[in-house]
Amino acid sequence: MTLDVSKVQTPMRIDRYLTQQVENMTRNKVQAAIEEGRVLVNGKPVKSNYRVKSCDHIHLTFLRPPAPELAPEDIPITILYEDDDLMVIDKEAGMVVHPAFGNWTGTLANAILHHLGKDADELDKTEMRPGIVHRLDKDTSGLIIIAKNPTALHKLARQFANRQVEKVYKAIVWGVPKAESGTIKTNIGRSHKNRKVMANFPYEGAEGKHAITDYQVVEDLGYFSLMDVTLHTGRTHQIRVHLQHLGHSILGDETYGGATPRTLPFSKSEPFTRNLLELMSRQALHAQTLRFRQPTTGEPLSFSAPLPEDMELVLEKIRTVMTASQS
């Protein structure tokens, strides 16, 4: 892993800096890596008390245990559609899509292998992503396409790359945008302050990758909004980062500013928002609609998944309290 230290970074011990910047990294792990010569700054080994400076170039070599073999697991999944080439699954919040460091079991990939049985032998399991065409964040619910053979995987991946797949999400956000609809265009890349999260950069700049998101307010809830959000690109955390950039973070999004209780201009609003966040213990984001073409026949396919129970409950609470506060 390489990290380029921000121009505005204040001096900080390298063990502390890497603990902040690298996911699942502890100070003990950093110090062990430094002692073993696996941390280089500007091409040279350093000690734990080295103070990181602006524009330093850090290279960190990980020593990770070999990944276990991907195994089928009997995990219930909701399949909305299945044919010889693909499945469309309504993923529940809290499920990781594929195994990775820290999450080797209990993933959607494990469930897919169990469901397909011997048919899964056609799929490449070496990268722990059998049939997975695209991803959803762990705590985002909703629709995901799974290819059942290499040809379908290739053709579906090409549809995504050519932006021929329509993806529409439902999001509950804090506040009501001034414009009922709009397009957000920025570059998205790793944050300079914390490499574990993504950040917005100028669209015409050199940093990050182009990201384009459309939004449409479908219900004005007074101090909240229910939105349709359409992705034109597929960057990591794109919707969450873009809605924070708009000034309307997704309710419950701990990483991007949506999980702190707020005081609103009506009586007992803070206990109310605190209760909402207890009910919505994740980002209120649901991949509701997918439109694409069947990879063999070219037939247009369209799918929609109902809002999950937690989002429906939160919407009901908001509507009830907003109606009472305005009466």
From Swiss-Prot:
Any GO BP: enzyme-directed rRNA pseudouridine synthesis
MF-aspect GO terms: RNA binding; rRNA pseudouridine synthase activity
S4 RNA-binding domain location: 12-84
SMART domains referenced in this protein's UniProt entry, alphabetically: S4
Keyword Endoplasmic reticulum (UniProt): no
Catalytic residues identified in the record: D137
The reaction(s) this protein catalyses: a uridine in RNA = a pseudouridine in RNA
Leading EC class: isomerase
E.C. numbers: 5.4.99.-
InterPro entries: PsdUridine_synth_cat_dom_sf, PsdUridine_synth_RluA-like_CS, PsdUridine_synth_RluC/D, PsdUridine_synth_RsuA/RluA, RluA_PseudoU_synthase, S4_RNA-bd, S4_RNA-bd_sf
Keyword line: Isomerase, RNA-binding
Coiled coil: none
PANTHER family reported for this sequence: MITOCHONDRIAL RNA PSEUDOURIDINE SYNTHASE (PTHR21600), RIBOSOMAL LARGE SUBUNIT PSEUDOURIDINE SYNTHASE D (PTHR21600:SF44)
Matches recorded under NCBIfam families: rluA_subfam
Family: Belongs to the pseudouridine synthase RluA family.
Protein name: Uncharacterized RNA pseudouridine synthase Cpar_0723
Organism: Chlorobaculum parvum (strain DSM 263 / NCIMB 8327) (Chlorobium vibrioforme subsp. thiosulfatophilum)
Lineage of source species: Bacteria, Pseudomonadati, Chlorobiota, Chlorobiia, Chlorobiales
